Every structure is written in structure tokens, then in C-alpha cells.
Swiss-Prot record:
Family: Belongs to the ATPase epsilon chain family.
Signal peptide: none
Keyword vocabulary terms for this entry: ATP synthesis, Cell membrane, CF(1), Hydrogen ion transport, Ion transport, Membrane, Transport
Annotated GO CC locations: plasma membrane; proton-transporting ATP synthase complex
Protein known as: ATP synthase epsilon chain
UniProt source species: Clostridium botulinum (strain Langeland / NCTC 10281 / Type F)
HAMAP family xrefs: ATP_synth_epsil_bac (MF_00530)
Function: Produces ATP from ADP in the presence of a proton gradient across the membrane.
Main localisation: membrane
Cell membrane recorded as keyword: yes
Subunit description: F-type ATPases have 2 components, CF(1) - the catalytic core - and CF(0) - the membrane proton channel. CF(1) has five subunits: alpha(3), beta(3), gamma(1), delta(1), epsilon(1). CF(0) has three main subunits: a, b and c.
InterPro entries, alphabetized: ATP_F1_dsu/esu_C_sf (IPR036794), ATP_synth_F1_dsu/esu (IPR001469), ATP_synth_F1_dsu/esu_N (IPR020546), ATP_synth_F1_esu_C (IPR020547), ATPsynth_dsu/esu_N (IPR036771)
């Protein structure tokens, strides 16, 4: 039995190797997921959210992850997503503007792809929330 898990996040632009940690908490399509050491192997879809992880010193950390896939295999957690940003890398003005645009598009549903606008709204809200933590 292992005491830790490894976390790595992959996006088209970058790979983020977090390394060994104690726990990962993120959000799948069916709700929150908590991954601890010795978790059963699995694959699931993820929503845009604030993914939380606890490092080996017990510090709580946050990182934005967009929609994607999470894979757990042999105490390794892989998140493959469209985008991932640490709080310090998020442009809050850009996120707020994206939120306003998405909300406006959703108000005018006749002219837009609703699913795409909803995802844009989820992404912008998660980016704003992570800056507020």
C-alpha cells in the first residue's frame, strides 16, 4: 500500500508535473471526486473546475482545469484537459470579460451554440473563483 499518489496535468500547450501528493479533489460530470492513495483504477470525464490537491506537507493547493479526462492508474492521476492555469497565471479581467460574453450569449439562445456558451461560462467562473481563494 502506497501512502502517496502522483499528479500530472497535460494540456495542448504544456505539461504540469505536480509530483507526489496526498490527495486530489476535482469535479466529474456526476459530481465531486476525491482521489486518495490506492484508489481503484478509473477513467472519467471532468467539468471545468478548480482542482484541489494536498501536497506532502499538508498544504492545500488549487489549479484551474478545463473540461477533459481524468485517469487513475497505479497511484498515478493524469488529467488531460484543454487548459490548466495556476491562480497566479489567471488574467482576472480577461476571465470577467469572458463570463460577461458567455452570459450575454446565453440570454440570446436563438443565435448561439448553447453548450459552447455554457462551457465558456463554467470556465470563466472557475477562473474567477480560483483568483478569489
Amino acid at each position: 500500500m502506497k501512502d502517496n499518489i502522483e499528479l500530472a496535468i497535460f494540456t495542448p500547450e504544456k505539461n504540469i508535473k505536480i509530483g507526489e501528493i496526498k490527495e486530489v479533489i476535482t469535479e466529474g460530470l456526476d459530481g465531486d471526486l476525491a482521489i486518495l492513495p490506492n484508489h481503484v483504477n478509473m477513467i472519467t470525464y471532468l467539468k471545468p473546475t478548480i482542482t484541489k490537491y494536498i501536497d506532502l506537507n499538508g498544504n492545500k493547493n488549487n489549479i484551474f482545469t478545463s473540461s477533459g479526462v481524468l485517469k487513475v492508474e497505479d497511484n498515478k492521476v493524469y488529467i488531460i484537459c484543454d487548459a490548466s492555469e495556476k491562480p497566479e497565471d489567471i488574467d482576472i479581467k480577461r476571465a470577467e470579460n469572458a463570463k460577461k460574453r458567455a452570459e450575454e450569449r446565453l440570454r440570446n439562445k436563438k443565435e448561439i451554440d448553447v453548450k459552447r456558451a455554457e462551457l465558456a461560462l463554467f470556465r470563466s467562473i472557475a477562473r474567477i473563483k480560483i483568483k478569489e481563494l
